């Protein structure tokens, strides 16, 4: 079943010039894509190619200059109030900059409850129980509930943001470079966790990244973005080979391997 359909999406930003005339900077150009229920898709590209702008459009944080985004066959531009609330519940996003994504004055408990208060019909006791449950799902314990963001490590705060997104049981989770600031061990742990949660909840994932290692470990399909366009789409198999220049550049980048768990029988 198709969850999200994007057709002919273009976007630009207007900048004021010295002459007083607005200049338009094109960021996306005629982007089309589909995401199906339960699948994991990567949006791969270098920094500045338009990935994050596309993500903001997909979740409704901005409106496109041209084109259409449909959720379950309904255009986002035509959703009524009730449909828009359901859409905000069904599609959640985890940003790269977790510090800017939370209120530093709020406790973790309050941060986790926030989307549940606005998007779900749960009693306070049920919200608190789910907050604790989501923390355990991301390998954190209740000791962080009364802490505030400045008291957490970067890795812990990113996991809190992931738990917050999962608390409303979304149908689509968008991860915008969400593990890029984590060390390799934490990255590998998050990938294992996402696979487990995806199997448990059947959530579709759009994994926005410039890191091919994450694509090969986590995704079924990959789209390569370059200069605001989708350069190519490939299935992720044993030997992933790109035909576009942008894909080959990323494939040839030298990156360290993911850490692999030793078997208990192996000697150090």
From Swiss-Prot:
Q: Does the record bear Membrane in its keywords? A: yes
Q: Does the keyword Cell membrane apply?
A: yes
Give the main location: membrane
Query: Could you cite one Gene Ontology molecular function of this protein?
Result: ABC-type nickel transporter activity
Topological relation to the membrane, as annotated: Peripheral membrane protein
Task: Give the similarity note.
Answer: Belongs to the ABC transporter superfamily. Nickel importer (TC 3.A.1.5.3) family.
Function, as annotated, reads: Part of the ABC transporter complex NikABCDE involved in nickel import. Responsible for energy coupling to the transport system.
This chain's protein is named Nickel import ATP-binding protein NikE
């Amino acid at each position: 079943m198709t969850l999200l359909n994007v057709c002919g999406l273009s976007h630009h930003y207007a900048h004021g010039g010295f002459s007083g005339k607005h200049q338009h900077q094109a960021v996306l150009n005629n982007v089309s894509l589909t995401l199906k229920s339960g699948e994991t898709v990567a949006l791969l590209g270098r920094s500045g190619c338009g990935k994050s702008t596309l993500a903001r459009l997909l979740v409704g944080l901005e409106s496109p200059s041209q084109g259409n985004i449909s959720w379950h066959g309904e255009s986002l531009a035509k959703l009524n109030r009730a449909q828009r609330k359901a859409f905000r519940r069904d599609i959640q996003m985890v940003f790269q900059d977790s510090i800017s994504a939370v209120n530093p004055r709020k406790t973790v408990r309050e941060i986790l409850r926030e989307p549940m208060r606005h998007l779900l019909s749960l009693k306070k006791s049920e919200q608190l129980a789910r907050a604790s449950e989501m923390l355990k799902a991301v390998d954190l314990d209740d000791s962080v509930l009364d802490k505030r963001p400045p008291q957490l490590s970067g890795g812990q705060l990113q996991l809190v943001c992931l738990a917050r997104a999962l608390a409303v049981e979304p149908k689509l989770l968008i991860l915008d470079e969400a593990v890029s600031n984590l060390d390799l061990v934490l990255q590998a742990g998050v990938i294992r966790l996402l696979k487990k949660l995806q199997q448990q909840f059947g959530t579709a994932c759009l994994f926005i990244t410039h890191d091919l290692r994450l694509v090969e470990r986590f995704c079924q399909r990959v789209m390569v973005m370059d200069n605001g366009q989708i350069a190519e789409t490939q299935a992720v198999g044993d030997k992933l080979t790109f035909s576009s220049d942008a894909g080959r550049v990323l494939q040839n980048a030298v990156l360290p391997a993911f850490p692999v768990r030793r078997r208990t029988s192996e000697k150090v």
